[in-house]
Amino acid sequence: MPKPHSEAGTAFIQTQQLHAAMADTFLEHMCRLDIDSAPITARNTGIICTIGPASRSVEMLKEMIKSGMNVARLNFSHGTHEYHAETIKNVREATESFASDPILYRPVAVALDTKGPEIRTGLIKGSGTAEVELKKGATLKITLDNAYMEKCDENILWLDYKNICKVVEVGSKIYVDDGLISLQVKEKGADFLVTEVENGGSLGSKKGVNLPGAAVDLPAVSEKDIQDLKFGVEQDVDMVFASFIRKAADVHEVRKVLGEKGKNIKIISKIENHEGVRRFDEILEASDGIMVARGDLGIEIPAEKVFLAQKMMIGRCNRAGKPVICATQMLESMIKKPRPTRAEGSDVANAVLDGADCIMLSGETAKGDYPLEAVRMQHLIAREAEAAIYHLQLFEELRRLAPITSDPTEAAAVGAVEASFKCCSGAIIVLTKSGRSAHQVARYRPRAPIIAVTRNPQTARQAHLYRGIFPVLCKDAVLNAWAEDVDLRVNLAMDVGKARGFFKKGDVVIVLTGWRPGSGFTNTMRVVPVP
């Protein structure tokens, strides 16, 4: 028998924590994790960055893309349409600056985060950056009088929810700025409340307000949201992060506003309160994905229960094969410091181990002093965490839970992932039009990156929502002979994989293709050595 080619099967991508990956039990897997095992070169988890004053210049955006940003999030709680239009233009300009080289080009998605039915305070002394100190025990009057909309200070605070006096009682608590400041209601009038500061701190302009336990009667989609969503459709955004989704009907309402023209926009529902957690299954059913928005969630439900909600939501999303994003305070201290706390490093890693498809940065990239360092840090932590996943058990369970199906794409996807484990493949190459074939493969959480080749730019951008998909945009004209066109795209994926260090000549890759043109015909799996 001829000796096997000495390089074959040593795909270095698979040596990462391989000893641990082959363990028989989860405990043994943990015992075998090795801090000196080099991680994989590809990162499978998507990184979403909020774009703000610290990061909206084209130059900075280029650096962020190089550092690993996959999705640019625009927070519509702040800023005008002109402001956001300029940011979108800058993101696209930064992305396209890499377009001359199809090997290195990375499509970046644009996400619109709605303001939603949230309550915010007014401006402090007319300035977006001013702050005032609220002292514990002090009296603070809350007013609905618009004369104070831009004149808030340490004595009087305007907020934008007109029915607040109807839904809070004397003794109710009001939380401001992600719960950092707490107020207790002492008396209520027709259009004002008198509160005592329980927990003080410095208060900035336009901060979020939470009323835990109050039956807040705000519409799921406000007038502002409708205008913002229509603006998003015009601007051709790729996804919407819908704030404060409480039930499936809220998601349908967002979809209705997006209309026919925005029917391909993915709707990611943000779960931010008790009702959203309680009705999670119906919301998941109606949505394209879920965001675990831990900021507001951690005020609306007790802080010590947030991790339970996070694990439950990520688990159910993984089971259903829908993307899930873990967000809020992931590297919060990096707003002001170049290194994260140990707890934050652990938090990012554990979100990845829980099964999150994407991890998100908010203030860290929007207004922080170290936006690039934050992106790089998430990239490095995610890579290490991905290597430490106990894939043996995960794949077994995902396969057991998946319903029996006669759909050729689903069956081929399971086969491709199983084969990728067996032969330690350097990557799984998928040719996909709508993206569905790649999503099916991602659902089974392979160790190897999924290189998804598509000619549809939106499919490429939206693919970042799914764990493990590395989208490649093919800009070549379609060849007449179907087989030649397949080879053209597979070869592009091979070139990208080699250039990115995912695999080298002689390694094995899995190739998943269709047997004829069009969507819905993916059914052929091949095991191919890299040329």
Swiss-Prot record:
<feature type="modified residue" description="N6-acetyllysine; alternate">
    <location>
        <position position="166"/>
    </location>
</feature>
<feature type="modified residue" description="N6-acetyllysine; alternate">
    <location>
        <position position="322"/>
    </location>
</feature>
<feature type="modified residue" description="S-nitrosocysteine">
    <location>
        <position position="423"/>
    </location>
</feature>
<feature type="modified residue" description="Phosphoserine">
    <location>
        <position position="100"/>
    </location>
</feature>
<feature type="site" description="Crucial for phosphotyrosine binding">
    <location>
        <position position="433"/>
    </location>
</feature>
<feature type="modified residue" description="N6,N6,N6-trimethyllysine">
    <location>
        <position position="3"/>
    </location>
</feature>
<feature type="modified residue" description="N6-acetyllysine">
    <location>
        <position position="89"/>
    </location>
</feature>
<dbReference type="GO" id="GO:0005829">
    <property type="term" value="C:cytosol"/>
</dbReference>
<feature type="modified residue" description="N6-acetyllysine">
    <location>
        <position position="62"/>
    </location>
</feature>
<feature type="modified residue" description="N6-acetyllysine">
    <location>
        <position position="305"/>
    </location>
</feature>
<feature type="modified residue" description="N6-succinyllysine; alternate">
    <location>
        <position position="166"/>
    </location>
</feature>
<dbReference type="GO" id="GO:0005524">
    <property type="term" value="F:ATP binding"/>
</dbReference>
<feature type="binding site">
    <location>
        <position position="207"/>
    </location>
    <ligand>
        <name>ATP</name>
    </ligand>
</feature>
<feature type="modified residue" description="N6-acetyllysine; alternate">
    <location>
        <position position="266"/>
    </location>
</feature>
<keyword id="KW-0810">Translation regulation</keyword>
<feature type="modified residue" description="Phosphotyrosine">
    <location>
        <position position="105"/>
    </location>
</feature>
<feature type="modified residue" description="4-hydroxyproline">
    <location>
        <position position="408"/>
    </location>
</feature>
<dbReference type="GO" id="GO:0035402">
    <property type="term" value="F:histone H3T11 kinase activity"/>
</dbReference>
<feature type="modified residue" description="Phosphoserine">
    <location>
        <position position="127"/>
    </location>
</feature>
<feature type="binding site">
    <location>
        <begin position="516"/>
        <end position="521"/>
    </location>
    <ligand>
        <name>beta-D-fructose 1,6-bisphosphate</name>
    </ligand>
</feature>
<feature type="modified residue" description="Phosphothreonine">
    <location>
        <position position="195"/>
    </location>
</feature>
<feature type="modified residue" description="N6-succinyllysine">
    <location>
        <position position="66"/>
    </location>
</feature>
<dbReference type="Pfam" id="PF02887">
    <property type="entry name" value="PK_C"/>
</dbReference>
<dbReference type="GO" id="GO:0004743">
    <property type="term" value="F:pyruvate kinase activity"/>
</dbReference>
<feature type="modified residue" description="Phosphoserine">
    <location>
        <position position="97"/>
    </location>
</feature>
<dbReference type="InterPro" id="IPR036918">
    <property type="entry name" value="Pyrv_Knase_C_sf"/>
</dbReference>
<keyword id="KW-0479">Metal-binding</keyword>
<feature type="binding site">
    <location>
        <position position="295"/>
    </location>
    <ligand>
        <name>substrate</name>
    </ligand>
</feature>
<feature type="modified residue" description="S-nitrosocysteine">
    <location>
        <position position="424"/>
    </location>
</feature>
<feature type="modified residue" description="N6-succinyllysine">
    <location>
        <position position="498"/>
    </location>
</feature>
<dbReference type="GO" id="GO:0004713">
    <property type="term" value="F:protein tyrosine kinase activity"/>
</dbReference>
<comment type="function">
    <text>Catalyzes the final rate-limiting step of glycolysis by mediating the transfer of a phosphoryl group from phosphoenolpyruvate (PEP) to ADP, generating ATP. The ratio between the highly active tetrameric form and nearly inactive dimeric form determines whether glucose carbons are channeled to biosynthetic processes or used for glycolytic ATP production. The transition between the 2 forms contributes to the control of glycolysis and is important for tumor cell proliferation and survival.</text>
</comment>
<dbReference type="GO" id="GO:2000767">
    <property type="term" value="P:positive regulation of cytoplasmic translation"/>
</dbReference>
<dbReference type="GO" id="GO:0003713">
    <property type="term" value="F:transcription coactivator activity"/>
</dbReference>
<dbReference type="InterPro" id="IPR018209">
    <property type="entry name" value="Pyrv_Knase_AS"/>
</dbReference>
<feature type="modified residue" description="4-hydroxyproline">
    <location>
        <position position="403"/>
    </location>
</feature>
<feature type="binding site">
    <location>
        <position position="106"/>
    </location>
    <ligand>
        <name>L-serine</name>
    </ligand>
</feature>
<keyword id="KW-1017">Isopeptide bond</keyword>
<dbReference type="InterPro" id="IPR015813">
    <property type="entry name" value="Pyrv/PenolPyrv_kinase-like_dom"/>
</dbReference>
<feature type="binding site">
    <location>
        <position position="482"/>
    </location>
    <ligand>
        <name>beta-D-fructose 1,6-bisphosphate</name>
    </ligand>
</feature>
<feature type="binding site">
    <location>
        <position position="296"/>
    </location>
    <ligand>
        <name>Mg(2+)</name>
    </ligand>
</feature>
<dbReference type="GO" id="GO:0005634">
    <property type="term" value="C:nucleus"/>
</dbReference>
